[in-house]
Amino acid sequence: MTGAGTPSQGKKNTTTHTKCRRCGEKSYHTKKKVCSSCGFGASAKRRDYEWQGKTGDN
């Protein structure tokens, strides 16, 4: 019977995110091949959302 306790945490030693070639952030998912910051790998367009700006900025 294995759980999600302290012994299981020692297995979490794989690198998930590496440096992105396009934006330079440490957000490029090596298994998914997609950057969570700029969207590199998923589309040619930059990842950008309306909710990213400050509230009240028009």
Curated annotation (Swiss-Prot):
PROSITE patterns to which the protein is assigned, alphabetical: RIBOSOMAL_L37E
Pfam (any one): Ribosomal_L37e
Binding note for cofactor: Binds 1 zinc ion per subunit.
Record keywords: Metal-binding, Ribonucleoprotein, Ribosomal protein, RNA-binding, rRNA-binding, Zinc, Zinc-finger
SUPFAM superfamilies referenced in this protein's UniProt entry, alphabetically: Zn-binding ribosomal proteins
Gene Ontology molecular function, alphabetical: rRNA binding; structural constituent of ribosome; zinc ion binding
Full protein name: Large ribosomal subunit protein eL37
